[in-house]
Amino acid sequence: MLLIYGIFAFVVLVFFYLLGKETGGEMEEEYRLREYLEVLKNRNVVILSVIAFIGVGIFTAYLTWVEPVLEEHGLTVETAGLTATAFLLGGIFGSIIIPALSDRAGKRKPFLYLCFIISAVLFYIHAIAFGMAMVAAVLFVLGFFFISALPLALDLSATSVGEQFAGTANSSLWLFSQVGSVVLIVLFESMASWNSTLLLSAGLLAVSFLLALQLKE
C-alpha cells in the first residue's frame, strides 16, 4: 500500500511540474537545476546523500514497523509502543550532546564514525535482546547515537559547499532520505522475519561507516 502511495505521489508531482509552471519561470528553473547539478559534483554531498538514504530510511521503517518488531522480542502491543519511546528519548539527548561535543572538538567525521559503528553494533544486540527492560535500555543508547548522526551530516554537507549552496546541499540529503524511507518501509515488510530487519539495519549502518571514511573535512 505504501508503495502505491509513493507511486501516486510521484505521478501527481510530474503532472504538477508539467501543468503548474509559472509563466517566465523557465530560466529560474534552469538555474536551479544547474545549481543542484553543481552541488552534486561535491563528493561529500553525494556520500552524505547516500548515507541519508540509509539512515533516515532505517529510522522511518523501524518506527513504522516497531510494534511487530518488538513483539518478536517478548513485548506486547501495549508495552511495545511505550518501550519504543526510549529510542526517541535517547535521540533527543543525543542530538543535543553529540553535536555539542563535535562543536567543541571542531570535528564532524570522528563523531559520525562513532555514531555509525555503535549503532550498527546496537542493532545487532537489539536482534538478540529480549524483555522490556533490556530492549528499552538498548533502544535508548541506540537512539542516542543513531539519531544524533543526522545533524552532524547536515552540518558537514553545508560546510562542504559553502554558505551559498548550503540549502541546496541539504535539500539533496532530504530528497534521498525520503526516497530511502519509502524503499526501506516496503523492504522491511517483505523480509522473512522482523528480526531480519534489525540485522539488515546493522549491515547497512556498517556500510554507512565505510562510506563515512571517504568523507573529507
Curated annotation (Swiss-Prot):
Sorted UniProt keywords: Cell membrane, Membrane, Transmembrane, Transmembrane helix
Cellular compartments annotated: Cell membrane
One Pfam family of this chain: MFS_1
Principal location listed in the UniProt entry: membrane
Gene3D superfamilies: MFS general substrate transporter like domains
Signal sequence extent: none
Transmembrane segments: 4-23, 44-66, 76-98, 111-128, 132-154, 166-188, 198-215
The protein's name in its UniProt record: Uncharacterized protein AF_2102
